Each structure stands twice: as structure tokens, then as C-alpha cells.
Amino acid sequence: MTGRYAFILAGGVGSRLCLLSERRAKPAVPFGGKYRIIDFTLSNCVNSGIFDVGVLTQYRPTSLNQHIGIGRPWDLDRTRGGVQLLQPAPGLATSDWYQGTADAIYQNLLHLKRRRAQEVLILSGDHVYQMDYNVLYAFHRRNHARLTVAVTEVPENEVSQFGILETEANGHVVAFKEKPKTAASGRLASMGVYLFDRDALIRWLVEDAAMSHSSHDFGKDLLPRLVARGEAVYAYRFPGYWQDVGTLDSYYRANLEFVQPKPPLDLSDPEWVLHTQTADRPPVRVAAGAKVTRSLVANGCSVSGEVVNSVLFPGVVVEKGAVVRDSIVMHDTLVAAGAELDHAILDKEVRVGRGAKVGTGDDMTPNRACPEHLSSGLVVVGKQARIPAGLVVGRNARIGAAVAAEDFTAPVPAGGVVDGPESMH
């Protein structure tokens, strides 16, 4: 068998991203001024010479499907290979939906068997990193592994968020614990990057599908089972930058890392291009008297006010006297004259009225609807929300998608919630 094939798991809900993923799949969330999160994984594939890719979608797939399309930005619009969007095809039973990451691959076994690949790469579509998968393939073959898991070392206080692997000196995995409470098992976290021998993967998936007690998930079921019975599972230590942006705080921090003088990844590297789907936009316009400091400003933006340590996506307008500070502002949003944003994340097509203040005060009361996700001082505003002139919005507030100006009856206190209608994408 020849060739290479990759599955990208892109159907997760991403509830910890709050409003940003309520109406779109997590891999479709915008990132870094012009990209979407899945662009990193797709670009890693083509930059590594993998041009046959299946993207498994399920939750709110519309934005993701529209973004990927036929794969032209990634040179994946091909007669042979290319990109295929693989959605579940449910019948009358709800069990036809993908029940877990392993089940998602199992339901596409026929698709896999048609591929002439000796190994199968299975990737998460919601992480920020740049990896040459050729190095992973070489490690896998050198160790005669059946499964190789890419791992990275995480801080001790974050081990409970990841699957943690224990290894021997040669990388052979001797133990695996899914989201342990302590770092007793070490700090080597699974990156959600798996390289399987094709035939072994097929056999293991069929075996797992027959187990009624299994949740059919790679991290919860398959990987622990394979390690426990001594299969040739190896861990490849990835030395580069890798970020799981699955929470509002991690998403916010990762975006702002890219405005620093030395960002964690070189997004302008001609040897490792980060491809994406982009619309034609005019150049950035910076008016006389405007001030832009340490920020990413995408095409089509017009800045007449002040932008500090922020990320502006295409088409954002910052009027005279407006201040955008430590914030992420998505496509075609208007920040009107005299308005101020501080530690805020605004989704697409938001309108912030004159003199409004979004993210203000010292009160750090956690959000009353999602305190576990919104407690560090960030304000999140949903797509197409309309914030009226002069409104004051406290820290940790959540303003829903498509909220109208008349939906606000008073200032929004710290931790406050203003909900909008459903059905926005």
C-alpha cells in the first residue's frame, strides 16, 4: 500500500468557548486575525505532503463546511484525493450520530478501506500548532509502532484537562490516564494526534464497536485499552508550540500571543504557509491621528481611533475617539466614536454604539450563566449584537447573539447576561 491519508476530527461541541461555539463548530471559530482554528491542521497536512484528507463534522457544521468548501486554498481541490467532508448519515435511530471519536472513524471504515495507505493519521481540528508530520511518520516506523501518539509537556496545574501518558526512555507508553486529578503520572499530554497502522486500526475499531460498555472514544477507551494489554504504543515528544484553545481564557491568551514582538509561530513563514479561505478586501486604512500599538489588523479594517494590544479581523471599523484595548474583534464589527472595549471578545458584525463602555470596572463577579467559563474579567459579545450608545458593560458579562439595542434596559453589571434569539450561524 502507498500514499498517506488523514482524518481530521472536527465535530466537537466546544461548550467551554461559550458564545463563540454555540452556533458553529469549534474548529470553525475565527483565530489570529484572518484564520479559523482548523486552518492549522489542514495546513500541517498539505505542508507535510498529505493531500488526501477526510474532515469529520457533526455539530453545527455550516460555517465549517462553507469555510473548507472544495479545499482550494489548501490545494485540496483534486480529482484524486483532496478533501472530503464526512458527516454522519443518521437514520431513524439517534445512535447513528457519531458517539465518540473512535466511533466517528468506525462509521467511515468503508471510506478508509478504499484508501491505499499503510498508516492512518487521525488529528484534532481545534488546536493551534505547526507540525511536520513527516517527522512523526519516521518516528513511528523507526520504532515499529502500531500506534504513535504525539505528546507535549503541559504545566502541572493543567494535567487534569488532558490525557496523560507515562513512557519508558525509548518512548514506549506504559500507562495512560485520561484527565487525572494530579500530576503523579507526569505531564506528557496527548495532543490529539494519532498515527495508526491501518490494519491494526481497523481491527481495533471493529473490536471496540462490539463493546457495549465502551463510549467509543480514543482517549477514554481505545488508548487505555491498548496500553493496558501491551500493544506497541509509542509517544512522540513534540518540541514545538502547541495550544489547546478550548476555553475562553486559552483562546484569548493564544490570540494575543501573536501580537507580541516574538510570536510563538511565524505566520509569515514562506516555507510553512498557513493557508485559509479569504475574501478580497481593500487595504487597511489608518486615519490621521489614529494610533495602533502592538496589534494585528487585517485587510479591510478602518482605524480612526486607538487600538492597543488587540486583534482586529477583516472589515472592523474603529471610529475617531474609540479605544480598543486588549481585545479580539471579529469581522465587520463597528466600534463607534467614543466607545471603549477592554478585555473583550466580539463576534462578527457587532455594533458598539457611541460612548459605550464594554469591559469596565474592578468588580470581577463571575458570569451568572457560565461562571466556570467566564470569570477572569473577559466580556463576550455574540454575533450581530447591537450595543446601544452610552451603555456600560461590566466584567465577565455575556451578551448574546443578535441582541437588539432595545433589549438592554439598564447597564449590564459584572457577571451579567443579556440573551439573544436563537438560530444565528
Report the location of each language-model feature:
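Unchanged
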Residues: 1-259, 366-378, 383-384, 413-425
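Left-handed beta-helix
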Residues: 1-5, 199, 206-425
